[in-house]
From Swiss-Prot:
The gene is lepA. It comes from Shigella sonnei (strain Ss046). One of its GO terms (molecular function) is GTP binding. Its EC number is 3.6.5.n1. This is Elongation factor 4. Belongs to the TRAFAC class translation factor GTPase superfamily. Classic translation factor GTPase family. LepA subfamily. GO terms for biological process: positive regulation of translation. HAMAP family: LepA (MF_00071). Residues 2-184 form the tr-type G domain. It comes from the Bacteria. It catalyses: GTP + H2O = GDP + phosphate + H(+). CDD domains: EF4_II, EF4_III, LepA, lepA_C. InterPro entries: EF-4, EFG_III/V, EFG_V-like, EFTu-like_2, G_TR_CS, LepA_C_sf, LepA_CTD, LepA_IV. PROSITE patterns: G_TR_1, G_TR_2.
């Protein structure tokens, strides 16, 4: 056991985690050169296309160190994006140490900080690594100072490497073996294994990634899931050397995978403890804290026949993604679907894309909203995650919106722009600290503004240099109103949105104008209105298409022309009474983009 090292790699997006893990795998000979490819651990197509890591992956490698010993390295690659920080905390729970990778050109960013604090809270040994020293812009001295200043760990002798060229990666491994402590635990004790992650395989059922804290797990053992009390047979187990390799046993301190022929998706929840049925452990390991979704949106299949398939797909996906929340919802405009909760907009996009790709579904999404706390006049507190669930105005005593605490790190040059953006988003500054050339800003901004497009706009106002980390702080009373969209006098529930009263006029007007461009012209006029309660705040009309009924009249009598026009007018009137308007998917997405183009 003293030769096992469990560690994960934490870093901001694009600081080179995945490339560094490629090099480590190459040096330890996990894959032959023929099988080696860039970002070997980002196995999802989506991860490769966007160049981001979404799911944590684990690898077990053997490394022969300079002291002649052979060490077993279990390492877990983690995502860097703010929406997936819960993946990071799960990976860290299985480790004794973490490599903190910082780009020697970019320096410390908000995500680096957030993940590093998570690691320190869990008492992990953090080993700083300066990556990308081959870049002309690299300034390792400055970045080492930044790490000490901002993060507060000693980085004077931080390992310097370039994962791309392979320089210094050997030193990273040596430092790893030297500084990260071996796992603790009792190999003879009763089995306790932590489920770090699980996913669904069409042939094997549920596959779980586990870390053995105490005891030993052998093939054929009967295992018991501690939270549900159900027992299963350990049919197959093994490790990843990126490839799945079968083993007969997993020893104390190791990380591996386990297949128990669990057919039910909720059979092995992530963060749960496995133990042996014949000799169970007394208590479960501390799990992970449940992550609360921050953004909710309705997802509806385009054709109602896909509803069943959609439900199964969500079930399988939620197994792999503990933070996805969903419940059935029906809408008069879109039929049956699900109200889903996500951690942020990127998470929402990724889930929607995975559903469309991996499960071949066509989906319509409604505008994302956050959860509001509503106190009704009867003093009852309810939580509303969809505009259609908001009680009538006269029943609301107080409406409170979620406030997010946003930590931003940015170069001083962009401070003015970023402050302007925060103020425009109704933010309140709570803290500002200068670290050399960097500024650490803390603002309290309403969650609704953060999830809408704050991240994109922060990046564009700071030319990509600012970085953001946010978490939910509290609910606070606010003057929010529901803006309804009426089409030909009928409310479309899927288009309603909740916004602050000060912005409601503008949002309503912009939305109506956007919709006007997106709804195809019909044979009759379509009136699009935005309303707060019964008060109409904006209107625009999609003009009808008209056939030229006078084309066949040459010269001729005016009364003849009037008769034809009158006849056409009556026909249009009749059409309008029975006509339905089909809304394209773009119309629903228009809400997302309200207020983006005119900035």
């Amino acid at each position: 056991m003293k030769n096992i090292r469990n560690f994960s790699i934490i870093a901001h997006i694009d600081h080179g985690k995945s490339t560094l893990s490629d090099r480590i795998i190459q040096i330890c000979g996990g894959l032959s050169d023929r099988e080696m490819e860039a970002q070997v651990l980002d196995s999802m197509d989506l991860e490769r296309e966007r160049g981001i890591t979404i799911k944590a992956q684990s690898v077990t490698l053997d490394y022969k160190a300079s002291d002649g010993e052979t060490y077993q390295l279990n390492f877990i690659d983690t995502p860097g994006h703010v929406d997936f920080s819960y993946e990071v905390s799960r990976s860290l729970a299985a480790c004794e140490g973490a490599l903190l990778v910082v780009d020697a050109g970019q320096g410390v960013e908000a995500q680096t900080l957030a993940n590093c604090y998570t690691a320190m809270e869990m008492d992990l040994e953090v080993v700083p690594v300066l990556n990308k020293i081959d870049l002309p812009a690299a300034d390792p001295e400055r970045v080492a100072e930044e790490i000490e200043d901002i993060v507060g760990i000693d980085a004077t002798d931080a390992v310097r490497c370039s994962a791309k060229t392979g320089v210094g990666v050997q030193d990273v491994l040596e430092r790893l073996v030297r500084d990260i402590p071996p796992p603790e635990g009792d190999p003879e004790g009763s089995l306790q294994a932590l489920i770090i992650d699980s996913w669904f395989d069409n042939y094997l059922g549920v596959v779980s990634l586990i870390r053995i804290k105490n005891g030993t797990l052998r093939k054929g053992d009967k295992v018991k899931v501690m939270s549900t009390g159900q027992t299963y047979n350990a049919d197959r187990l093994g490790i990843f050397t990126p490839k799945q390799v079968d083993r007969t046993e997993l020893k104390c301190g190791e990380v591996g995978w386990l297949v128990c022929a669990i057919k039910d998706i909720h059979g092995a929840p992530v963060g749960d403890t496995l133990t042996l049925a014949r000799n169970p452990a007394e208590k479960a390991l501390p799990g992970f804290k449940k992550v609360k979704p921050q953004v909710y949106a309705g997802l509806f299949p385009v054709s109602s026949d896909d509803y069943e398939a959609f439900r199964d797909a969500l079930g399988k996906l939620s197994l792999n993604d503990a933070s996805l929340f969903y419940e059935p919802e029906s809408s008069s405009a879109l039929g049956f679907g699900f109200r889903c909760g996500f951690l942020g907009l990127l998470h929402m996009e990724i889930i929607q894309e995975r559903l469309e790709r991996e499960y071949d579904l066509d989906l319509i999404t409604t505008a994302p909203t956050v959860v509001y706390e509503v106190e009704t006049t009867s003093r009852e507190v309810i939580y509303v995650d969809s505009p259609s669930k908001l009680p009538a105005v006269n029943n609301i005593y107080e409406l409170r919106e979620p406030i997010a605490e946003c930590h931003m790190l940015l170069p001083q040059a962009y401070l003015g722009n970023v402050i302007t953006l925060c103020v425009e988003k109704r933010g309140v500054q709570t803290n500002m600290v200068y670290h050399g050339n960097q500024v650490a800003l803390t603002y309290e901004i309403p969650m609704a503004e953060v999830v809408l497009d704050f991240f994109d706009r922060l990046k564009s106002t700071s030319r990509g240099y600012a970085s953001l980390d946010y978490n939910f702080k509290r609910f606070q009373a606010s003057d929010m109103v529901r803006v309804d969209v009426l089409i030909n006098g009928e409310r479309v529930d899927a288009l309603a949105l909740i916004t602050h009263r000060d912005n409601s006029q503008n949002r309503g007007r912009e939305l109506v104008e956007k919709m006007k461009d997106l709804i195809p012209r019909q044979q009759f006029d379509i009136a699009i209105q935005a309303a707060i309660g019964t008060h109409i705040i904006a209107r625009s009309t999609v003009k009808q298409l008209r056939k030229n009924v006078l084309a066949k009249c040459y010269g001729g009598d005016i009364s003849r022309k009037k008769k034809l026009l009158q006849k056409q007018k009556e026909g249009k009137k009749r059409m309008k009474q029975i006509g339905n308007v089909e809304l394209p998917q773009e119309a629903f997405l228009a809400i997302l983009h309200v207020g983006k183009d005119n900035k």
